[in-house]
Amino acid sequence: WIMGHMVNAIEQVDEFLDLGANAIEFDVDFDDDGVAKYTHHGIPCDCGRLCTKYAVFTEYLDYVRQVTTPGDPKFRKELVLLALDLKLQRISSEKAYAAGVDVATKLLDHYWMRGWNGGRAYILLNIPLVEDYEFIRAFKDTLRKEGHEQYNAKVGINFTGNEDLDEIREVLEKLGEDEHIWQADGITSCFPRGTERLKKALEKRDTPGYKYISKVYAWTLVRSSIMRRSLRLGVDGVMSNYPDSVVKVLKEKEFSDKFRLATYADNPWEKFTPI
């Protein structure tokens, strides 16, 4: 999975897909009551990027629905995963439950269309800190109450704050979640980051019977040397400001027979097992 990073304006969606991304990450900004308002990162953000691009959240969902609905004139078959970077750290943890209800409801109304020809992409809920775990409970509760639990099959969970992996597992156990789990490891592209935690996450993913990590990705990679380093370790995905650079690296002899771009036929919730 090549994840285009900080794709917050509607016009950037096709721009990043044209560069080779098959997944996009966008920031979801909330008001003080936990209502998702905009796709917006704000200042500071990654080096060399404009931090202020934004869209109204529901309008953004309407657009990506079209891009991921077969038969729609805007359909792009390569876009298979949407990662929502939920800016819950900007609001009180007490509002995490309200935020979960709001995001689930807006996805039902504007993306899935409650079963009426909605978008088909997989959804990854990127949660910054384990203390905001009530967001997940609220999201699942809302799908159940609205009679649309079938969409759980399309939704995964990912804690992105580089917290202790065992603490993350404990929170997932508390929630009763042991599938559809990704694990991110990374830092803003402005700073270097070692591989110690990334290696631990990959080790857990590859431990037979370990349920709490099915995919691991590294973010936000801009240098080809760091992309190569991550691929050598065996990541499932790379988040980058430059998807075309990742495409180029994947074509190199060292990687071209080991990796390929994920398509809609690839299940993002299953561990990859080499043949």
UniProtKB/Swiss-Prot annotation:
| Cofactor-binding details, from the entry | Binds 1 Mg(2+) ion per subunit.
Q: Which GO terms describe its cellular component?
A: extracellular region
The record's top EC class is lyase
Q: Matching InterPro entries, A to Z?
A: PLC-like_Pdiesterase_TIM-brl
Q: What cofactor requirement does the entry state?
A: Mg(2+)
Gene Ontology biological process terms from the UniProt entry: killing of cells of another organism; lipid catabolic process
Q: Which CDD domains match?
A: GDPD_like_SMaseD_PLD
The entry's keywords:
Cytolysis, Dermonecrotic toxin, Disulfide bond, Hemolysis, Lipid degradation, Lipid metabolism, Lyase, Magnesium, Metal-binding, Secreted, Toxin
Q: Which SUPFAM superfamilies match?
A: PLC-like phosphodiesterases (SSF51695)
One function term, GO molecular function aspect: lyase activity
Q: What reaction gets catalysed by this protein?
A: an N-(acyl)-sphingosylphosphocholine = an N-(acyl)-sphingosyl-1,3-cyclic phosphate + choline; an N-(acyl)-sphingosylphosphoethanolamine = an N-(acyl)-sphingosyl-1,3-cyclic phosphate + ethanolamine; a 1-acyl-sn-glycero-3-phosphocholine = a 1-acyl-sn-glycero-2,3-cyclic phosphate + choline; a 1-acyl-sn-glycero-3-phosphoethanolamine = a 1-acyl-sn-glycero-2,3-cyclic phosphate + ethanolamine
Its job: Dermonecrotic toxins cleave the phosphodiester linkage between the phosphate and headgroup of certain phospholipids (sphingolipid and lysolipid substrates), forming an alcohol (often choline) and a cyclic phosphate. This toxin acts on sphingomyelin (SM). It may also act on ceramide phosphoethanolamine (CPE), lysophosphatidylcholine (LPC) and lysophosphatidylethanolamine (LPE), but not on lysophosphatidylserine (LPS), and lysophosphatidylglycerol (LPG). It acts by transphosphatidylation, releasing exclusively cyclic phosphate products as second products.
What protein name applies here? Answer: Dermonecrotic toxin SpeSicTox-betaIIA2i
